[in-house]
Structures are given as C-alpha cells and as structure tokens.
C-alpha cells in the first residue's frame, strides 16, 4: 500500500515580527485517525476554542477547497484540495476576545456539487453543546441552515455521536479543542 504524507508548514509573521498565524496544508494518504495524530500539536498561544478536522476523501473525485463561512473564529491553516483516496487536514480556531466559540462552515467543490462541513464549539459549555453537520448541495450552504436544520438540511448531530448525511459520515468530540473526523464517500 502506498503511503505518503506531504506537510507544508508556513509561519507567517506580522509586520511587528510577532507570529500572527500558523498555516498548515496537509495532504495524506492515510485515514482520519492517523491524520489526527499528525496534527495533534497544532494549538499554541492564545487559542481559546477550536476544532481540528481531518477529511478523508473515499470518492473518485478531488475535493477542491472552495472557502469558508466564518461565524466566530477563523481558518487557522491552509485549506487543502483533497485528491481521491487521501485525507486533508485543517484547523479552525478562536482566540481571545469576545465570549464566542469556534463556529463556521468549510466548503469543498465536488464535481458540480458542494460538500458543506459545519462545526460549532461553544465558549460556555454550561449553556451550549458542540454540534456538527454536513450536506452536499449545488451551492455553499449557510451556517444557519446547517445549525438549525433549515431548508431541507438534516438537524445537526451532537458531539460524541456519529452523524451520516449525503454520503458523508462525521464525528465531533466534546472538547474546547475538538477533533472533527469526516469521511466522504461521494
């Protein structure tokens, strides 16, 4: 079995010379569990909430990075294109500031369709829980549809449970720095 891992580490510096962001693009011909181990040491500094995500592409087409829809926080790494039978990894983080969690949607182009992946990691675990969802549509799906189960979207899956929607299986852990595993079959 061919096993390859390509890691690209770029450390971006702000004009003042202080590290402002770490960008990491990863394409790996490994499963989601191995991919999670490869990026287990990403969070550093003042990240309060976040999720690291491994997307395993078991389909026959490349998943092309289409961008994000941030609600709170931002994509802290490079969003990679994911070839067939490979796994791409990225990190979403929320640093100090407003009392909000790490919340957003990542979009991948798949042929003429879009794979939308949503995670919501709360700031206050006493009031909220973590939720995840996915949907394959013909356009970028807004966060509100994925979070509230609107406009034909299945209601999201609570952390600690496997969700399955549109040929996509996913699992989100219940932690402030959550692990989000996505297995896309197409």
Swiss-Prot record:
Superkingdom of origin organism: Eukaryota
Region forming the signal peptide: 1-20
Example GO BP: monoatomic cation transport
Record-level Gene Ontology MF annotations: channel activity; toxin activity
Primary localization class, coarse: other
SUPFAM superfamilies reported in the protein's UniProt record: Cytolysin/lectin
Gene Ontology CC terms: extracellular region; nematocyst; other organism cell membrane; pore complex
Keywords attached to this entry: Cytolysis, Hemolysis, Membrane, Nematocyst, Secreted, Signal, Target cell membrane, Target membrane, Toxin, Transmembrane
Location in or out of the cell: Nematocyst; Secreted; Target cell membrane
Pfam families reported for this sequence: Anemone_cytotox (PF06369)
Motif extent (Cell attachment site): 158-160
The keyword Iron belongs to this UniProt entry's keyword annotation: no
Domain free text: Composed of a long N-terminal alpha-helix and a core region rich in beta-sheet structures. Before the pore formation, the alpha-helix binds the lipid membrane, partitions into the lipid-water interface and stabilizes the monomeric molecule on the membrane. Finally, it traverses the bilayer, thus forming the transmembrane pore.
Quaternary state and interactors: Octamer or nonamer in membranes. Monomer in the soluble state. In vitro, interacts with folate receptor alpha (of target organism).
The family this protein is said to belong to: Belongs to the actinoporin family. HALT subfamily.
Function statement: Pore-forming protein that forms hydrophilic pores and causes cytolysis. Compared to equinatoxin-2 (AC P61914), it reveals lower cytolysis activity (5-12-fold difference, tested on erythrocytes), a larger pore size (probably 2-3 nm) and different affinity to membrane lipids (100-fold lower affinity to sphingomyelin). Binds to sulfatides (SFT) as well as to the two sphingolipids, lysophosphatidic acid (LPA) and sphingosine-1-phosphate (S1P). It seems to bind more strongly to LPA than to S1P and SFT.
Name this protein carries in UniProt: Hydra actinoporin-like toxin 5
Source species: Hydra vulgaris (Hydra)
């Amino acid at each position: 079995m061919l096993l390859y891992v390509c890691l690209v580490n770029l450390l971006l510096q702000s004009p003042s010379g202080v590290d402002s962001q770490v960008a990491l693009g990863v394409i790996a011909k490994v499963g989601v569990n191995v991919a999670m181990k490869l990026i287990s040491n990403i969070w550093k500094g003042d990240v309060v909430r976040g999720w690291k995500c491994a997307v395993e592409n078991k389909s026959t087409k490349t998943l092309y990075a289409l961008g994000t829809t941030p609600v709170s926080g931002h994509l802290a790494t490079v969003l990679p294109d994911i070839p067939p039978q490979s796994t791409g990894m990225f990190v979403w983080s929320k640093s100090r500031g407003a009392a909000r969690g790490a919340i957003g949607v990542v979009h991948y182009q798949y042929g003429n369709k879009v794979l939308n992946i949503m995670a919501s990691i709360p700031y206050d675990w006493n009031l909220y829980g973590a939720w995840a969802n996915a949907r394959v549509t013909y356009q970028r799906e807004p966060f509100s549809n994925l979070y509230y189960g609107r406009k034909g979207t299945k209601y999201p899956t609570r952390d600690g449970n496997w969700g399955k929607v549109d040929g996509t299986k996913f699992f989100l852990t219940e932690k402030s720095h959550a692990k989000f595993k996505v297995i896309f079959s197409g």
